[in-house]
Amino acid sequence: MTESVRKFEQELATFTGAPYVVTTDCCTHAIELCFRLLQIKTCRFPAHTYISVPMTMKLLGVDYEFSMTPWRDEYQFLGTPVWDSARCLKPNMYRERQYQCLSFGHSKPLDNVRGGAILLDNEEHYKQLKMMS
């Protein structure tokens, strides 16, 4: 890991209140890594989301259902501790024992770079996700 990535992860952790941050190339891959790590096989999420979300579920063989629940900044994959926080970046936004997947890019809260990140508080999972990313 480069020094600039390490510094960005530390600053993002401080800003969001997350004990650990793992950067990725996009939010979709952050979600995929969390589902793989946690071996999630079923979930429910809003029908009005990014097309890459159901595509990722299909790729992973996850049984999913759509809900008509409206969302604004972020939503939880119901039945899991994983959140799609693609449109959210706020001070102290981290939720304990959760995996919040962020997105950086055009029309997102941090739009001068392209990428993603996972906010979490489990040190062992942090180490595993770092190796997977």
Identify the function of each model-found stretch.
Residues Y20, T42, F77, Q98-Y99, ...:
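Short acidic donor-binding loop at the edge of a beta-strand
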Residues N92-F104:
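A short alpha/beta connector and helix-capping loop motif
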Residues L33-N92:
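PLP-dependent aminotransferase-like
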Residues T28-A30, T49-I51, A86-L89, H106-P109, ...:
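Short, solvent-exposed loop/turn segments at secondary-structure junctions
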Residues V5-C43, V53-L60:
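Phosphate-binding glycine-rich loop
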